């Protein structure tokens, strides 16, 4: 197997295996295989640390280190650096929770009922919730008028959300980026929209405790919808800029947490109507083979595909394509950014055409329309 490039370094098969072993240990509290770490050098450990940063799972990987025998752990110098970064992740998670609860309280005090997508809504499912590296706050209002009302209340506080080309709205709350999404998911296939709306009515959002030291409640998608939304989210990033281990870990943790709460037949039928069955075989194969998710935790029983194609994509470009040279290049011109997005999708279209051809086609069509509109503008 070929080595994968990480910045200017090479992530070897040994380092990839070590990182996945540590992730599995943190997720399922299982002892890592000692033989994987017996020949690790200081340089190998540096590679694992760098890769865990780029995949935004460094705190979880550090947690996995605590289950290693002391004689197999990295040097004290590296361990101290890693623990310091873990502490920073925990601090940022606390800050995120404070900002989220403050925003939810503000919106609910004004009679609004936002739904928390991804983020802290998934972090609460983790064995160690504060170790999930947070990004921004994603909200959705099932009633469109409530989003408009939210913007009015925000404007009264001097906050003016910026409209994005994809229809979402972006602003900052207590220093944390917030995004209001017009839809539960960005599924591009127009013929699947009726199915999504039907599922949203059939499996309404639920009120759950946020946890993590607070008694607060938040609204999140139902278990059924949550897994479907994550499936689509991962697909879009896999055929676009890139997908990282954090999103895959989110999915694995969700599958394990929701075991017994999802009707297998209904989930498979919904996946079929959304044309996701072939993609699910690849995605579920990765979860079982690379993250050691017990197969009985999958939403339904199926014949799995090998997850190697997806794993290759993950190692190459990392979380949201942050390792990609295309993503790292800067430009002040929006059309150049659109060209890089189009080129990224074109270069990874083989994965999409093979496992989700309809969604890949309509995503490419939507991107092309967006570029034409920007040129006319």
Positions of PLM-derived features:
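Conserved NTP-donor binding/palm subdomain of two-metal-ion nucleotidyltransferases/polymerases, i.e.
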Residues: 2-135, 141-377
């Amino acid at each position: 197997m070929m080595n994968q490039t990480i910045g200017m370094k090479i992530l070897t098969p040994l380092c990839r295996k070590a990182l996945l072993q540590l992730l599995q240990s943190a997720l399922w509290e299982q002892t890592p295989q000692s033989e994987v770490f017996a020949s690790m050098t200081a340089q190998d450990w540096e590679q694992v640390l760098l890769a865990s940063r780029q995949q935004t799972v460094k705190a979880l990987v550090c947690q996995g280190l605590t289950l290693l025998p002391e004689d197999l752990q990295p040097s004290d110098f590296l361990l101290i650096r890693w623990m310091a970064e873990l502490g920073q992740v925990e601090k940022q998670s606390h800050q995120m929770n404070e900002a989220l609860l403050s925003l939810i309280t503000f919106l609910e005090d004004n009679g609004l009922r936002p739904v928390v997508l991804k983020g802290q809504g998934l972090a609460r499912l983790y064995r160690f919730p504060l170790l999930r590296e947070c990004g921004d706050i994603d909200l959705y209002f099932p009633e469109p008028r409530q989003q408009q009302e939210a913007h009015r209340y925000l404007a009264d506080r001097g906050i003016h959300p910026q409209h994005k080309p994809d229809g979402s709205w972006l602003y900052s709350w207590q220093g944390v980026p917030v995004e209001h999404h017009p839809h539960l998911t960005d599924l591009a296939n127009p013929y699947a929209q009726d199915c999504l709306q039907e599922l949203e009515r059939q499996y309404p959002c639920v009120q759950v405790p946020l946890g993590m030291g607070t008694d607060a409640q938040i609204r999140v998608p139902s278990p059924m919808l949550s897994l479907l939304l994550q499936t689509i989210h991962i697909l879009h990033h896999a055929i676009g800029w890139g997908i990282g281990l954090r999103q895959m870990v989110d999915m694995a943790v969700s599958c394990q947490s929701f075991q017994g709460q999802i009707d297998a037949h209904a989930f498979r039928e919904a996946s079929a109507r959304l044309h996701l069955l072939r993609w699910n075989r690849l995605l579920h194969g990765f979860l079982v083979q690379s993250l050691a998710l017990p197969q009985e935790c999958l939403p339904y029983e199926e014949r799995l595909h090998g997850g190697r194609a997806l794993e290759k994509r993950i190692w190459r470009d990392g979380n949201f394509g942050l390792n990609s040279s295309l993503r790292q290049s800067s430009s002040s011109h929006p059309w150049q950014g659109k060209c890089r997005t189009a080129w990224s999708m074109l270069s990874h279209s083989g994965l999409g055409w093979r496992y989700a051809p309809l969604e890949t086609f309509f995503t490419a069509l939507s991107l092309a329309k967006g570029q034409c509109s920007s040129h006319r503008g």
